[in-house]
């Protein structure tokens, strides 16, 4: 457990040694609010909690977008694997295909007894592969994408837990502040006199 230092009394909010694979820090649950806010300005604590909340919401958005992109990429790679299998099954015959030239623009082609297949590698690079080599390249890419997808899903779950913990911390500090202000009001002292 992290300890409060005199140099930065707000640093305890994060357990710096506990992070995910993507280096997202874990927020500390404030179990003893009175001890945590002692000798600190409550407004600064709120500010720090809000900053942490915004950072986690940013991570959540980034990870959600990443998951969406990786899911789409995984589907595309699976479709490519299915196409390689389909073309290989028709390697002893001629057939017609429609292919996409660019987004929304298609063309037809006649394929005569294919013995290999071409894969787009990106950056306007296309290479010819045997069916087995193409399958190997696509499977390797799909495995990498699926692993990244799994890690992103785990990180998103972690971030959602941190958002929940931060929300609870904000509520606990807010409630503590309200109780302290009520006590001051009942005692007849002002906040300035209490300090």
Swiss-Prot record:
Gene3D superfamilies: 1.10.287.370. CDD domains: Prefoldin_3. InterPro entries: PFD3, Prefoldin, Prefoldin_subunit_alpha. Pfam families: Prefoldin (PF02996). GO terms for biological process: microtubule-based process; protein folding; tubulin complex assembly. GO terms for cellular component: cytoplasm; prefoldin complex. One of its GO terms (molecular function) is tubulin binding. Keywords: Chaperone. It comes from the Eukaryota. Belongs to the prefoldin subunit alpha family. Binds specifically to cytosolic chaperonin (c-CPN) and transfers target proteins to it. Binds to nascent polypeptide chain and promotes folding in an environment in which there are many competing pathways for nonnative proteins. Heterohexamer of two PFD-alpha type and four PFD-beta type subunits. This is Probable prefoldin subunit 3. It comes from Dictyostelium discoideum (Social amoeba). The lineage of its organism: Eukaryota, Amoebozoa, Evosea, Eumycetozoa, Dictyostelia.
């Amino acid at each position: 457990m992290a300890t409060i230092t005199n140099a930065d009394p707000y640093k305890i909010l994060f357990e710096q040694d506990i992070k995910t694979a993507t280096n997202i820090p874990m927020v500390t649950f404030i179990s003893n609010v009175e001890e945590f806010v002692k000798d600190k300005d409550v407004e600064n604590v709120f500010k720090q909690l809000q900053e942490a909340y915004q950072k986690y919401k940013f991570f959540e958005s980034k990870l959600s977008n990443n998951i969406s992109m990786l899911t789409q990429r995984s589907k595309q790679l699976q479709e490519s694997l299915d196409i390689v299998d389909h073309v290989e099954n028709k390697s002893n015959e001629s057939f017609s295909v429609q292919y996409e030239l660019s987004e929304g623009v298609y063309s037809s082609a006649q394929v005569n007894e294919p013995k290999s297949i071409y894969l787009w590698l990106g950056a306007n690079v296309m290479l010819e592969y045997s069916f087995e080599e193409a399958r190997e390249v696509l499977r390797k890419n799909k495995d990498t994408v699926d692993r990244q997808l799994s890690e992103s899903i785990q990180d998103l779950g972690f971030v959602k837990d941190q958002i929940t913990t931060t929300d609870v911390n904000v509520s606990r500090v807010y409630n503590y502040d309200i109780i302290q202000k009520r006590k001051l009001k009942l005692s007849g002292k002002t906040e300035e006199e209490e300090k």
